[in-house]
Amino acid sequence: MQLIRKPGRIGQQPCDGVNVYIAHCESADGSEVFLEHRMVADVKGLMTLDIRLGQPTEGATRLDHPLFLICTHGKRDRCCAIKGRPLAAAMHNLYPEVVWETSHSKGHRFAPASVLLPWNYSFGRLSAVDAKGVIEDAQRGIVHAEGCRGRGIYTPQGQAAELAVRRQADTWGVDDVARVDVDGTTAVVVLYDGPSDRDKVVEYEVALELSLIHI
C-alpha cells in the first residue's frame, strides 16, 4: 500500500473523500493487468472494498492511463524529498492525471525513486527526460529501459533475470514476459514469441550470482 498526494500546496489541502487506486499488477489467469479508481468517504472506507485479484472492484472505474508514483518521503531519507519533489512537480505539470507523490518505495538510495502502475515496475535516478520517457513509453505499452530496476511482482533474483533477458532479447513490451521462475541460483524467463502470438513462448535460462544482485 502506498500513500499518495498531489505535488505542491494542492496536495496538502483537505479534500472531500479519498482517492483510491487499485493496481492489479498480476492476474491469476494470465490476462492483462489493469488499474482502477474509486472514491471512498474516508480511510475507514478502505475496509469496505472487496478487492480480488484480476476481478473488477465494485464501484470502481477502470483507467486507460498508468500511474507514476515518485517517492518524496523525506522522513525516510532526505534525498527522496530533495530529489523527488522537484521531479514530481515537473512531471505533474505535464501529466496531471498520471503523476503523484508517494510514501516510501524501495531503493531510497536510488533517489528519485519511482513506481509505475499497474505493472509495478520500479525506477531509480531518473532525469526529467527519462521520467517523461517512462510515462510516454508506458502509454504506448513499452517498458522504459533507462533507470528500470525491476518488476515488484518478482523476487529480487527474478527481477534481475527479467531485465537481463529483456536486454539480451531487446524486447520491452509491457506484456512480453509470460512468467519468471527462480530456483536457487537459476532463473527461467519465459517470453511470448512475438507480440501477436500468445500460444508460443521462448525460454531463457539465467545463472544468478546472488551476491551481485542489488534491486
Q: Where are the language model's segments positioned?
A:
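Internal, well-folded beta-alpha domain core
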Residues: P66-L67, H73-A90, V98-E209
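Cofactor- and metal-binding active-site motifs of prokaryotic enzymes
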Residues: M1-L63, R109-S122, L126-A128, L210
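Conserved small/polar residues in nucleotide/adenosyl-binding loops
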Residues: I213-I215
